[in-house]
């Protein structure tokens, strides 16, 4: 089971939270499509800003968007000009008040989305798929890191028959629900067609917090 399903979806409600946090009844479908448009617009506009994920929260007619990025300076711009232009564009897109928060990713080598996109960009620049994967694993597996696994799929090296090839180091316990595993995919557009990239990064176990029961008379 753990080998097949999305590791993030499997852990939602256990050690992971939803990336869209709001409640709606009749207009639920419209808001889901609106979230999709917001994410697509941000990822397209900030495709060079190393954006990992976008979290969306809603309250009344206000939308709070949190952008996790490894290059906050590029997102904010000089004097906040870029983030203000982005806020106005999103307000025009949705017709609602938009508030944008920027969160810096301090360890991009531990972010599966950024690692997958880095491998994809190297493949587009004609770097060997073996070399791209091995370099990504070496950067991720520094002292104290638990494990990482990468996989590339399709016509590797221009071969006639599609295949997959993966590399791993350390442990990636997909069946352990308390294991904090980050997972992401990316696509590389090459002269031989698209190549799919998958990355799993194990960042250690997340143990539930123990609530201390208050005992009377102590």
UniProtKB/Swiss-Prot annotation:
The keyword Ribosomal protein applies. Residues 38-106 form the KH type-2 domain. It holds the Pfam family KH_2. GO terms for molecular function: mRNA binding; rRNA binding; structural constituent of ribosome. GO terms for biological process: translation. Keywords: Ribonucleoprotein, Ribosomal protein, RNA-binding, rRNA-binding. It comes from the Bacteria. Gene3D superfamilies: 3.30.300.20, Ribosomal protein S3, C-terminal domain (3.30.1140.32). PROSITE patterns: KH_TYPE_2 (PS50823), RIBOSOMAL_S3 (PS00548). GO terms for cellular component: cytosolic small ribosomal subunit. The keyword Hydrolase does not apply. InterPro entries: KH_dom, KH_dom-like_a/b, KH_dom_type_2, KH_sf_prok-type, Ribosomal_S3_C_sf, Ribosomal_uS3_bac-typ, Ribosomal_uS3_C, Ribosomal_uS3_CS. SUPFAM superfamilies: Prokaryotic type KH domain (KH-domain type II), Ribosomal protein S3 C-terminal domain. Part of the 30S ribosomal subunit. Forms a tight complex with proteins S10 and S14. Belongs to the universal ribosomal protein uS3 family. Binds the lower part of the 30S subunit head. Binds mRNA in the 70S ribosome, positioning it for translation. This is Small ribosomal subunit protein uS3. It comes from Geobacillus stearothermophilus.
């Amino acid at each position: 089971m753990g080998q097949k399903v999305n590791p993030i979806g499997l852990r939602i409600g256990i050690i992971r939270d939803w990336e869209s946090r709001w409640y709606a009844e009749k207009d639920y479908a419209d808001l889901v499509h609106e979230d999709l448009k917001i994410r697509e617009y941000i990822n397209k506009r900030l495709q060079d800003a190393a954006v990992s994920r976008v979290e969306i929260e809603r309250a009344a007619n206000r939308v709070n968007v949190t952008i996790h990025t490894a290059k906050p300076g590029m997102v904010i711009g000089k004097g906040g000009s870029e983030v203000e232009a982005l806020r106005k564009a999103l307000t025009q897109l949705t017709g609602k008040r938009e508030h944008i928060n920027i969160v810096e990713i301090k360890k991009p080598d531990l972010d599966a989305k950024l690692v997958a996109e880095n491998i994809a960009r190297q493949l587009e620049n004609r770097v060997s798929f073996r070399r791209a994967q091995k370099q990504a694993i070496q950067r991720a597996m520094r002292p104290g890191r638990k494990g990482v696994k990468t996989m590339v799929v399709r016509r590797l090296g221009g071969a006639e028959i599609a295949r997959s090839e993966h590399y791993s180091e350390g442990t990636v316990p997909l069946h352990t629900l308390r294991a904090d595993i980050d997972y992401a995919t990316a696509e590389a557009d090459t002269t031989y067609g698209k190549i799919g990239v998958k990355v799993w990064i194990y960042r250690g176990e997340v143990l539930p917090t123990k609530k201390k029961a208050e005992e009377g008379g102590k």
